[in-house]
UniProtKB/Swiss-Prot annotation:
GO terms for biological process: cytidine deamination. It comes from Vibrio cholerae serotype O1 (strain ATCC 39541 / Classical Ogawa 395 / O395). This is Cytidine deaminase. InterPro entries: APOBEC/CMP_deaminase_Zn-bd, CMP_dCMP_dom, Cyd/dCyd_deaminase_Zn-bd, Cyt/Deoxycyt_deaminase, Cyt_deam_dimer, Cytidine_deaminase-like, Cytidine_deaminase_bacteria. The gene is cdd. The keyword Metal-binding applies.
Length: 295
């Protein structure tokens, strides 16, 4: 990954490459740009907003983990706070393809796990597939979300997904990224369980009521959280493990460095993530211990 990031930086225009390199290679870079940092990039580059976001896509794509397709896709989400979040696609050799995370899903979940309450726009290398269009239609900002592609005028999500089916069609009025706290608690004193519980409490699961969260502990001691992101169309739902893995990937972590995992989910939900979580962790490393709690 580091080599691909270096290569991407070498492609950047000279007008802002030094400043961008300083940001991206900083030890505390978290694959986001603050509104102020992005404004400085705009000033240095002299580019239009849309052109600069497209120009930065190779940086996002450099984070991709695509051992199956070797097709590296990047995405950049702008949260309603003005901060920009990078994302990339993620695949798992040995796992069924349904465990794949698309770049759009990665960038959106990245923003969500860092506290964003909505997405203003998303910039991607290629036209979003139907799966991702439906995933984005779950968002709090689905009606106003803009999609930017290279060499094209921005369009709204609803232009890409006319006569769309979404949460409202199932009687749900709160979208993905709505601020929630399900208020679940546990006396379990295992740290990773408590961290997974934190993720569970912000999860979006209005259709199955399987509020759930995952926590991953790395060898470095860092812990990454993932909350379940359910979708009105069911299949585009993003499991909590994949959300947690996306957070780790966007911090430059290697999946080989996962030391332990925990899953907490609702005991009364209509589905369970346990079997799929175990299966996906198994293909990453069969020795990863998984703690489990059903509340």
């Amino acid at each position: 990954m580091r080599n691909r990031i270096e290569q991407a930086l070498q492609q950047m225009p000279a007008s802002f490459a030094p400043y961008l390199r300083e940001l991206v290679l900083a030890k505390d870079f978290d694959a986001t740009f603050s509104a102020e940092q992005y404004q400085q990039l705009l000033t240095l580059s002299g580019m239009e907003d849309s052109d600069l976001r497209v120009a930065l896509l190779p940086i996002a794509a450099a984070y991709s983990y695509a051992p199956i397709s070797e097709f590296y896709v990047g995405a950049i989400v702008r949260g309603i706070s003005g901060r920009l979040y990078l994302g990339a696609n993620m695949e798992f050799t040995g796992a069924q393809l349904g465990q794949t995370v698309h770049a759009e899903q990665c960038a959106i979940s990245h923003a969500w796990m860092k506290g964003e309450k909505g997405v203003a726009d998303i910039t991607i290398n290629f036209s979003p597939c139907g799966h991702c269009r439906q995933f984005m239609n779950e968002l709090t900002t689905a009606s106003s979300l803009k999609i930017q592609l290279p060499k094209r005028a921005a369009k709204t999500l609803q232009e890409y997904l006319p006569e769309s089916f979404g949460p409202a069609d199932l009687g749900i009025d709160s979208g993905l990224m709505s601020p929630v706290n399900h208020g679940k608690t546990s006396d379990d004193d295992e740290e990773l369980i408590q961290q997974a519980l934190r993720a569970m409490n912000i999860s979006h699961s209005p259709y199955t009521q399987n509020f759930s969260g995952v926590a991953l502990k790395m060898r470095s001691g860092a812990i990454y959280l993932g909350a379940y992101a359910e979708n009105a169309a069911f299949n585009p739902s993003l499991p909590p493990l994949q959300v947690a893995l996306a957070q780790a990937m966007m911090m430059g972590e290697s999946f080989e460095d996962i030391e332990a995992a925990a899953l907490v989910e609702s005991a009364t939900g209509k589905i369970s993530h346990l079997a799929d979580t175990q299966a996906t962790l198994e293909v990453i490393n069969p020795d990863i211990p998984l703690s489990y709690l059903s509340l």
